[in-house]
Every structure is written in structure tokens, then in C-alpha cells.
Regions:
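Extended active-site neighborhood of metal-dependent phosphoesterases/phosphodiesterases
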Residues: 56-136, 171-182, 223, 227-237, ...
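Beta-strand-turn-beta hairpins that frame and shape the catalytic cleft
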Residues: 1-5, 103-113, 138-146, 199-204, ...
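Binuclear metal-dependent phosphoesterase catalytic core
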Residues: 21-24, 175, 195-274
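His/acidic metal-ligating clusters that form di-metal
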Residues: 30-43, 124-203, 235, 264-274
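N-terminal active-site segment of His-dependent metallophosphoesterases
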Residues: 1-61, 139-140, 156
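Active-site environment of divalent metal-dependent phosphoester hydrolases
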Residues: 12-15, 52-56, 79-87, 119-122, ...
Length: 274
């Protein structure tokens, strides 16, 4: 089974830019690239920061664009989103407490989409109501589960990013840790960085966004880093007993070579010339 993971698309008004890049144009590039190479994906998930300022017009445009897209797409919200504006356009994605949380079953397992947004702060929260929802979902089904969320649920050891991580990380990790045998993977966004690790013993990964990129600048302790690294999305393959995660840099414009020999048993300088 194949799944596509996008994050941090940061939609703006048409023609507006962030860091000299056009978020709408780059999101369109990501959609086209993904459909060209991965039209057989079972699901696409976008893990938050759908709009840069939570503007209603961004969500309206996104709804229209995704309604036209041939692959099924599910959404999480992030710190740049406004829950009320989002739910006015996507009302079917609210849980019983008014948070943007839900379920989608796939061949690889049951996907749970989590809402870690908190108004007017870039840090994430996961309150008692949301923890209760997640506990109930994990308890009512045998799994396996795939968790999708915006904020990083563990430290990344870059001080500016960790100030805006999921602040309720301890109760969150305790909860998922109790169910770790049923959870295959945790996918998140927020940092605009390729990241891999574990959450309470559960494999976790993140990636760059589809517009602007960060950089792991460990010497910077106050401000978030920004770079001109290529835009990216994720391609995830699931087998019975493995998960493989790729970050595809669709924004890379340089040459790509093929090399080596189709006969991979050949072991000589001539056929292996590069």
C-alpha cells in the first residue's frame, strides 16, 4: 500500500509569496508531481498549516481544488490555521468536541487525524478532550493505527523549534505508549525539516513543506532558520512487516543521472564507471 504525506502548504492569496516562493503555485506543482508518479496511492494526507494566516478564502480554494483531485485527501490543521474558518468549509471533519479529528481506514491500517492547534500560539496543545478522543479510538479497535498530526511530539533539539513543539508531549507520549503495540507510525509536520525518530517507542517521521524550508542550524537559539532547499512531499510504502518513508524533493531543478550497469552482478571498473 502507498500513501502520500504532504505538510505545511501555507496557502496565501494568489500571487503572494513567502520567502520569495509562491505557496499556491508550489502546492499545484506538488499535486501534479505526486499524481504523475504516484497515481496509485491509496490516500494523501496533509498535516497542517494549510493556510498561512487561516484565511477563509484559502480554505475555500483548497476545498475546490481537492474536490477536483482524483486521489482521496485527508487534512489536519496546524498553528497557522484557524479552526473555525477551516470547519466552516470542511464541517464534516469535526469530532464531537469541535476539534479537527477523524478516522480513515486503509489497507495499511486505521488512520487517526489529530488536532494539535491552539489559538494564537505557534506551540501545540493536546487537551483532555482531545486525549480522551484519542484514547477511545485506540481502545475501540485492534489496529494497526497510523497517526497524523501537525506539531512535533518529541524534542528535535533545535531550541527555536522546541519552543513551539507539542507542549502536552508528556501525556501524549504516555497515552500512545500504552498502545504502542497497535501503532505502526506517527507522521507530523511543523518543522519544515526531514526528521526521523520515535515517540514512546513508535517510529515517527517528518519532512519539508511544499513551499519554504528550514535548516538544522544548531547554533541558532532564538529564531527559526530558513533556507532555499527544495520543496518536498513524502511517499510511504507499507508492507506486512515494514514501513518505508521517502522524501521526494519535487522542487529540485538540477540534473538527475542514471549510472551503473543493469547487470548488478558485474564488478569491474568499466561497467561501474561514473
Amino acid at each position: 500500500m502507498k500513501l502520500l504525506h504532504l505538510s505545511d502548504i501555507h496557502l496565501t492569496a494568489p500571487g503572494a509569496t513567502i520567502g520569495g516562493r509562491d505557496p499556491r503555485a508550489n502546492f499545484e506543482r506538488a499535486l501534479a508531481h505526486a499524481l504523475r508518479d504516484h497515481h496509485d496511492a491509496e490516500l494523501m494526507v496533509i498535516t497542517g498549516d494549510l493556510s498561512d494566516w487561516g484565511d477563509l478564502t484559502d480554505y475555500q480554494w483548497l476545498r475546490q481544488r481537492l474536490d477536483e483531485y482524483p486521489l482521496p485527501v485527508r487534512l489536519c490543521i496546524g498553528n497557522h490555521d484557524r479552526r473555525a474558518a477551516f470547519l466552516s468549509v470542511f464541517p464534516d471533519l469535526a469530532d464531537e468536541n469541535g476539534f479537527v479529528q477523524g478516522i480513515h481506514d486503509t489497507a495499511a491500517g486505521r488512520c487517526l487525524f489529530l488536532d494539535t492547534a491552539h489559538p494564537e500560539t505557534h506551540a501545540g496543545r493536546y487537551c483532555e478532550d482531545r486525549l480522551g478522543w484519542l484514547e477511545a479510538r485506540l481502545a475501540e479497535h485492534d489496529g494497526p493505527f497510523l497517526l497524523f498530526m501537525h506539531h512535533n511530539p518529541m524534542p528535535v533539539h533545535l531550541a527555536p523549534f522546541d519552543q513551539i513543539r507539542l507542549l502536552d508531549e508528556a501525556p501524549f507520549r504516555q497515552l500512545v505508549g500504552r498502545h504502542r503495540a497497535k501503532i505502526r507510525h506517527v507522521f507530523f509536520g511543523h518543522c519544515h525539516l526531514p526528521l526521523a525518530g520515535s515517540v514512546a517507542g513508535i517510529p515517527a517521521s517528518s519532512l519539508r513543506g511544499t513551499n519554504h524550508a528550514s535548516f538544522p542550524l544548531f547554533s541558532e537559539t532564538r529564531l527559526l532558520s530558513a533556507s532555499d532547499l527544495p520543496q518536498a512531499y513524502g511517499v510511504v510504502f507499507f508492507g506486512d512487516d515494514y514501513v518505508t518513508v521517502h522524501m521526494v524533493e519535487f522542487g529540485y531543478d538540477g540534473p538527475i543521472r542514471v549510472e551503473g550497469s543493469p547487470d548488478y552482478k558485474a564488478w569491474d571498473r568499466e561497467t561501474m564507471a561514473r
